[in-house]
């Protein structure tokens, strides 16, 4: 990042490897804030939505932190990383074991994350 340092806000979803994402942006010269505070998120200039793990667990954490409406109302640029990008769609076929229903996601992008069809291949 050239010139003055850019400020990046990482949304603390509770389901992410935040230290890796933070370190990557700091190496690029960015000033980084990590937060789950809705007021700080709403005022941020640029946002990162990271995620690791499963869609159901991440959405549960985002709901518990009362971040859904805040994230859905953002007008500024948001970069989804890994699971964070997947959570930006309407729903995911990934679900809790024993639950056949799709996981409702953030619905920022119309679409659905589909399971890979492996046709009996081991992955």
Residue ranges and their predicted role:
Residues 1-7:
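Extreme N-terminus of proteins, especially the signal/transit-peptide cleavage junction
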Residues 8-30:
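N-terminal beta1-alpha1 ligand-phosphate binding loop
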Residues 14, 38, 112:
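Residues in the short beta-alpha loop(s) of Rossmann-like NAD(P)-binding domains
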Residues 31, 46, 77-79:
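Structural signature of beta-strand start/N-cap positions in the alpha/beta core
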Residues 31-32, 113:
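Generic structural signal for residues in well-ordered beta-strands
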Residues 32-43:
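Short acidic low-complexity segments
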Residues 41-51:
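Short acidic/histidine-rich motifs immediately flanking catalytic phosphotransfer sites
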Residues 55-123:
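Cysteine-nucleophile active-site neighborhood
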């Amino acid at each position: 990042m050239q010139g003055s340092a850019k400020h990046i806000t990482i949304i603390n979803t509770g389901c992410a490897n935040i230290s890796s994402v933070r370190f990557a942006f700091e190496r690029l010269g960015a000033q980084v804030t990590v937060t789950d505070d809705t007021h700080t998120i709403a005022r941020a200039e640029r946002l990162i939505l990271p995620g690791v793990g499963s869609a159901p667990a991440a959405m549960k954490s985002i709901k518990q932190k009362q971040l859904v409406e805040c994230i859905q109302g953002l007008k500024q640029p948001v970069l989804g990383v890994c699971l964070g990008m997947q959570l930006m769609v309407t729903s995911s076929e990934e679900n809790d074991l024993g639950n056949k229903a799709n996981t409702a996601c953030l619905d920022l992008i119309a679409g659905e994350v589909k399971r890979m069809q492996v046709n009996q291949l081991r992955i």
